[in-house]
Amino acid sequence: MTMPYYASPEQLMRDKSEYARKGISRGRSVAVVTYADGVLFIAENPSSTLHKVGELYDRIGFAAVGRYSEFESLRVAGVRLADVRGYSYNRRDVTGRVIANAYAQTLGEVFTQQMKPFEVELCVAEVGETPETDQLYRLTFDGSVVDEPDFVVMGGQAEAVSANLREHFLPGMGLAEALRVGVQALSAVSPATSAGNGGPALLTAEQLEVAVLDRRRPKRAFRRIAGAALRPLLDRQEEDGVVAGEEPHTAAHAPSVPQPGAPAGLGDPGAPDTGGTAGSGGEAPTT
């Protein structure tokens, strides 16, 4: 008589963890960094339509790496949860902690009960009235949730990018300085730059997805920085002679106001309220 196949629960959990980590490691890195006026999202993402970064609610943002179809479904579920809770109770009852806990429960249930875990890693960020009240929640494939200070890094090169940020990050940086530090950290490990493939020293605007949660904006704090608004900030880095590995310098505070040519951000007078879904998105499939 043939003995039935058996695997211990510990072995099953190890196999699931290894499978999920391999999927996440193929994704390009994302950095979420706090700065003086809010929270900055920086992602290496050459796609202009499949986003890694999006808005969940008035002052709450979302970033992810991994399998696009899986975390896009989580993003949509988060938007719906926030809208229903805000409509049923009060908009102030929608917090980053509430959404992070809901994500943690879903990820944990899938990891323990389903054969295949989600190959995703998430960050839920909430901008507060002051820098001390900003919140960054990091969620992993098994439902673990951690409240991170200062910054969160996700993706295949997360450890190397985190080490670079720990060396150069300063609390209270302006937008331009925070962007410089984040792009430098991502560029140092990217195969698209000179460090990996003989390309430019820093990632270009076409290779980046950048957005902010600006605490000074009324109602909806989320705003994307792209095109004509992003290029001057990156060009300023090259003019200052910033290259990967160079010691940083403290820049003057640069207010995060929209620049000419920037797409209409959520909450702008010229952009109508679209009910919490406009400007949100997911990531391109992992490569």
Curated annotation (Swiss-Prot):
Pfam families linked: Proteasome
Activity modulation: The formation of the proteasomal ATPase ARC-20S proteasome complex, likely via the docking of the C-termini of ARC into the intersubunit pockets in the alpha-rings, may trigger opening of the gate for substrate entry. Interconversion between the open-gate and close-gate conformations leads to a dynamic regulation of the 20S proteasome proteolysis activity.
Gene Ontology cellular component list: cytoplasm; proteasome core complex, alpha-subunit complex
Gene Ontology terms for molecular function: threonine-type endopeptidase activity
Gene3D superfamilies found in the cross-reference section: Glutamine Phosphoribosylpyrophosphate, subunit 1, domain 1
Pathway(s) this gene product operates in, as recorded in its UniProt entry: Protein degradation; proteasomal Pup-dependent pathway
Assigned protein family: Belongs to the peptidase T1A family.
Protein name as it appears in the record: Proteasome subunit alpha
Taxonomy of the source species: Bacteria, Bacillati, Actinomycetota, Actinomycetes, Geodermatophilales
